[in-house]
Structures are given as structure tokens and as C-alpha cells.
């Protein structure tokens, strides 16, 4: 994806991220229909590799894929179904509404060896926090896609709760049933 980042840095510093669907090895996988447009906010070249920070701006639907000779894929996209992403309306959820989710996420992240600065997260906007945790989580690509496609923060919160419930019935205590 080095060429994609190079091309982006020459223009608007934006890239679209789309998850591939599970496909057969050695084939070009089909893409999920919903992705997210992100803006590169930090860029470092490290020995031919890039370390970037990407700020998610707006979800989109794929209209069709554009054929090209580039080592990355391009698509015609549409933002119409995600106009609410552009509105900065305050959601009714509060951090206190998420205490159980945070507790379960902390347990899962610890179990998987993830290190998260929770105090820093609690200083961020709630929407940014939920989105960052959803994408940084050890959830499967399909589970992350479900979260991406969730219509709003309340639905995303409920989906995270449902996904967490599938990981371990006993609160991530490694209990085995035979």
C-alpha cells in the first residue's frame, strides 16, 4: 500500500478503507459494501515503510470498482446513506452507560495482550472512543464490519455488547466446559 499512500499524499491525503470478504487464497477477494474514508493526519517514512495516523471521517457505500493498473484497488463511492456521520450532534450515551462494555473490553484486551491507555480514551469524544475501541479490538474482520455498518452509536454499543457476549460466557475467566 506504499504507492496508495504516496498517491494520497500528493493530493488530498485521504484514503478509503474497505474490508475484503473472506475469499479463496490466490484470488482477488470481493469487498464489503461499506467502508470508511479517512484522512492521513500524521505521516512518517521508516525505511520504505510508512507509519500513519488515519482519522476516520465518513462511512461510504461502494457503487462499483474502478479497473486500474495500480497495486491497490479504487472504487466509485457514495456517502448518501451516512450523512449523519457528518453531523456533530451529541449522542445521549455517557461513559457511565458503557462501564460494563469497558470492563469486558478491558478483560478481553488484557487476555489478548493488548495495552490500551484507558484514561486517555476517557478524555476523548465518546463517539471517537467507541469507534477506536471497536476497530482496535481483537474482534474478527466480520465483527468489525458489523460495527462499521451500525447506524449510530447506540446500535454500535449494543452490537459490541452482543459480540463480547459471544467471546466467553463467564466474563473472560478462561473457564472450560467439557
For every predicted segment, state its role.
Residues 123-126, 148-153:
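Small/polar glycine-rich anion-binding or flexible loop at a beta-alpha turn
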Residues 121-139:
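Core structural elements
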Residues 134, 145-148:
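Amphipathic alpha-helical segments within well-ordered protein domains
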Residues 2-115, 142, 146, 153-156, ...:
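Positively charged
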Amino acid at each position: 500500500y506504499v504507492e496508495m499512500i504516496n498517491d494520497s499524499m500528493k493530493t488530498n491525503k485521504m484514503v478509503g478503507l474497505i474490508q475484503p470478504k473472506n475469499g479463496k487464497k490466490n484470488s482477488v477477494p470481493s469487498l464489503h459494501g461499506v467502508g470508511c474514508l479517512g484522512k492521513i493526519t500524521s505521516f512518517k517514512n521508516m525505511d520504505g515503510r510508512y507509519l500513519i495516523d488515519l482519522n476516520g471521517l465518513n462511512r461510504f457505500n461502494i457503487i462499483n470498482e474502478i479497473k486500474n493498473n495500480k497495486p491497490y484497488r479504487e472504487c466509485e463511492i457514495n456517502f448518501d446513506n451516512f450523512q449523519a456521520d457528518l453531523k456533530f450532534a451529541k449522542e445521549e450515551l455517557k461513559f457511565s452507560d458503557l462501564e460494563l462494555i469497558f470492563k469486558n473490553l478491558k478483560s478481553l484486551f488484557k487476555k489478548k495482550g493488548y495495552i490500551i491507555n484507558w484514561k486517555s480514551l476517557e478524555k476523548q469524544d465518546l463517539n471517537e472512543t467507541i469507534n477506536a475501541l471497536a476497530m482496535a479490538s481483537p474482534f474478527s474482520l466480520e465483527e468489525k464490519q458489523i460495527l462499521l455498518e451500525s447506524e449510530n452509536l447506540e446500535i454500535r454499543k449494543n452490537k459490541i455488547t452482543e459480540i463480547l457476549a459471544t467471546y466467553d460466557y463467564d466474563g473472560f475467566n478462561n473457564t472450560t466446559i467439557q
